[in-house]
Amino acid sequence: RSLVGSEMCIRDRKNIVRKEIPMGSKTLVLETGKIARQATASVIASMGGTVVMCAVVTKPSAEGRDFFPLSVHYMEKTYAAGKIPGGYFKREGKPTEIETLTSRLIDRPLRPLFPDFYVDEVQVNCMLLSLDKDNPPDVVALMAASAAMSIADVPFRGPMAAARVGFINDEYVLNPSFAEMDESDLDMVVAGSESAVLMVESDANELSEDLMIGAILYGHQEMKPVIKQIDEFAKEVLPEKSDFTNPNEEEEKKIFSEVSEQCTAGLSEAFTTTDKKERGEKISSVKEALLDGLDEELHNSYLKQFKEVEKHIVRENILGAQKRIDGRDLTEVRNISVETNFLPSVHGSALFTRGETQAIVTATLGSGRDIQTCLLYTSDAADDWFC
């Protein structure tokens, strides 16, 4: 019995692929084949004592689907930092604010790397398994997601990588620790492919535009070697991917030509109408005329190309006539008005209007008893900032 178990263990080890990738003064470790084997692809990424597992699962598209159902979920487990959830509830509940924001952080650079024709369902699940006090998990999660997507048999035009950039003592710092971030004038996360920056997220003190642009370029330059290493890792795991091509390419070109011929004149007139409501009515009229007489099963195909024609006309107007939809030139700002004390019994209120967009904004003052506190994973203190 033990011999069989040993043979299974040896066989399992043969399927494990591990790669160590230098990144500045730190090392990113990618490993696959050990955990979550039933997923389409899974990767465990670690940097120091911070470990994130990412599992990607795909499902064939439903008939008639015309959008890409990609969902990204990032989850933090309190055991990762050796802590127990505080308060009345001792189990993890709904996603925290940081989990939601990190999920979006991962989603934004992944989504543009899929072709428009790909509509299979894709779920990306990242879970923080271990956390040290030197390596924030969001960048590690981004790398894990990129690596997992790269070894999945999907038309992912990656890989991509990410880097955190700090600015301490007039110098850029790559992937600063939590302690270094407390001293930094900049907390920027940059993600991108080898050829382009795909996402930038930052908090900063007052820094010049040149310093901010320099931070983006610095982060992108530092991640390029990592992208090549992730690509090598992916090719070792999955030497060849399936040949993904758009099966409806010729048909879509034909429909686009038909829609363009029928709708360009009406849409061009609509996009010179400055009133938003009237413009919407004209666009709806053109759309109804297009769909009139078509079989219902063709509606989605024609509506998709209708959107493409809309984008083409708006783009041509901006580049050619240097005018936006509402008649403004490219440097003109909408009319702005502000009315304060908009609500009589509220501590502070304002009505902000810009063009046809409005916002009612309120402020309420409270005492120290009203502060929201939450347990920090990285220290024994409680944070009085929103979490």
Question: Residues of each region from the PLM?
Answer:
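Mobile "lid/hinge" segments at catalytic clefts and subdomain interfaces of large enzymes
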Residues: P155-L267
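Extended amphipathic alpha-helical scaffolds
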Residues: R13-K59, G64, T245-L376
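Conserved mixed alpha/beta core segments that line enzyme active sites in large multi-domain catalysts
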Residues: I16-G24, V29-E31, M127, D132-P137, ...
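Single conserved hydrophobic/aromatic residue that forms the stacking wall/gate
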Residues: R1-I10, Y377-C387
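Gly/Lys-enriched N-terminal cap/neck module of very large, oligomeric protein machines
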Residues: G33, A39-S42, Q123, G158-A162, ...
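Glycine-rich, flexible beta-strand/loop modules in the N-terminal catalytic cores of phosphate-handling
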Residues: A39-Q123, L128-N135, E194, E201, ...
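Generic secondary-structure signature for well-ordered alpha-helical cores
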Residues: K77, R111, P115, S150-V154, ...
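Alpha/propeptide regions of enzymes that mature by internal proteolysis
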Residues: I16-V17, T40, F67, G93-P115, ...
